[in-house]
Design a protein with these regions (language model features):
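Short, acidic Ser/Thr/Gly-rich low-complexity loop/linker segments typical of extracellular
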Residues: 45-55
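Short, ordered, surface-exposed loop/turn motifs in non-cytosolic proteins
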Residues: 29-43
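A short, amphipathic beta-strand motif
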Residues: 22-30, 54, 90, 102
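Hydrophobic beta-strand segments
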Residues: 37-41, 68-69, 104
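Surface-exposed, low-complexity/disordered segments
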Residues: 88-338
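A short, solvent-exposed loop/turn motif at the edges and junctions
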Residues: 69-80
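Short Pro-Gly-centered beta-turn/loop motif in secreted/extracellular proteins
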Residues: 57-65
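Bacterial Sec-dependent N-terminal signal peptides
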Residues: 1-24
């Protein structure tokens, strides 16, 4: 082998090794991987999010950030230095709160399964928060097919950043409030449905729950152009949690976390903008009923609608407090029209 070829091979191997370096988050108490840990930079950008194996790419950690805040299960685990995270394994004290038991109100077989719970959803652009919503909603499932029949929001509040704009040619500063959506909860009662599709599936059996991660992607090699916009690199990651060692039915369902990625720009913008949508749902009640009429309001994304301070409940997934700690007065709530 020629010297130049040997050097080329060595460089390829070197860069492959460097690019593949990861940090794995483990539970300090169970020594098991911690998925869904968000790593915040000092400016409030979300720079990494651990996969089902508890891993993040090491190259997402920039030494210039100096301090990073880790958030797990909607609670801050504290502030960490670059040196503390620049390791193969980082053990975290994750037992912030116990898993809330889902209250089963009725065990009698019926036409519908009603699952009530708390949700939050938010959109980031190039890692920075753009808009946020949380609230209380009830999903109605067909008890025979286990498919979602309707999504009914009971109350909610929406936040936006004052710095967001509505310039159609600036996707990096666009206000994405109109794109806020609820978790879809697609096939959470038929987890086997995912196995028949061309998706990557991984499972993690933890001490307290079983988790399933489903990953899909599209437009990896080419962009799509429409009305002056460019769309590229679409990806989704669904993480669904069930009772430990359960059959993974609707009765066993305890949490859903959905993340949708895409790169978007106007044709006049030099670089793509990384847009990420996070959608999370945490069941609190399960009921069986032959009626599917539930309390709901119209989900108007220009206002908030609530009658109670539901977010003050200790079990509520209140990410708004995390974001407010970074963005202060710039994070504004839309007017409550109760």
């Amino acid at each position: 082998m020629k010297k130049t070829q040997l050097l080329s091979l060595l460089f390829v191997l070197l860069f492959t090794f460097i690019g593949a370096q990861t940090t794995t988050f483990l539970s300090e108490k169970t020594n098991q991987p911690l998925p869904k840990v968000s790593v915040f930079g000092k400016d409030g950008t979300i720079i990494a999010y651990s996969d089902i194996d508890g891993k993040i790419e090491r190259n997402t950690l920039n030494p210039s950030q100096e301090k990073f805040q880790l958030v797990y299960e909607n609670f801050s685990l504290g502030t960490f230095s670059y040196a503390e995270l620049n390791k193969d394994v980082v053990k975290l004290n994750d037992r912030v709160k116990d898993i809330e038991a889902v209250v089963i109100k009725n065990n009698k077989p019926a036409k519908y399964v009603l699952i009530k719970g708390n949700f939050n959803a938010y959109v980031t652009v190039n890692g920075k928060l753009n808009c946020y919503v949380d609230g209380v909603a009830t999903y109605v499932f067909d008890n025979k097919t286990k498919k979602v029949k309707s999504t009914n929001v009971e109350q909610y509040r929406i936040y936006y950043l004052e710095t967001a704009k509505n310039d159609l040619k600036q996707m990096g500063s666009w206000d994405y409030s109109s794109s806020l959506e609820f978790p879809k909860l697609r096939d959470v009662g038929n987890i086997g449905e995912f196995k028949s599709k061309k998706l990557k599936i991984k499972e993690l059996k933890g001490n307290a729950k079983d988790e399933v991660e489903i990953t899909g992607q599209a437009l990896q090699q080419k962009e799509v152009a429409f009305f002056g916009y460019r769309l590229y690199d679409i990806k989704s990651i669904l993480n669904i949690s069930y009772e430990k060692d359960s059959k993974k039915t609707l009765r066993d369902f305890i949490e859903s976390n959905e993340i949708y990625f895409m790169k978007l720009k106007h044709k006049t913008e030099p670089q793509y903008n990384q847009v990420i949508s996070y959608r999370n749902f945490y069941p609190t009640e399960l009921d069986f009923s032959d009626k599917n009429d539930v309390e709901k309001v119209k989900f108007d994304k220009d206002i908030s609608q609530y009658k109670t301070n539901y977010w003050q409940d200790a079990s509520f997934p209140n990410m708004q407090t995390i974001f407010s700690s970074f963005f202060k007065e710039d994070l504004k709530e839309k007017e409550n029209k109760k």
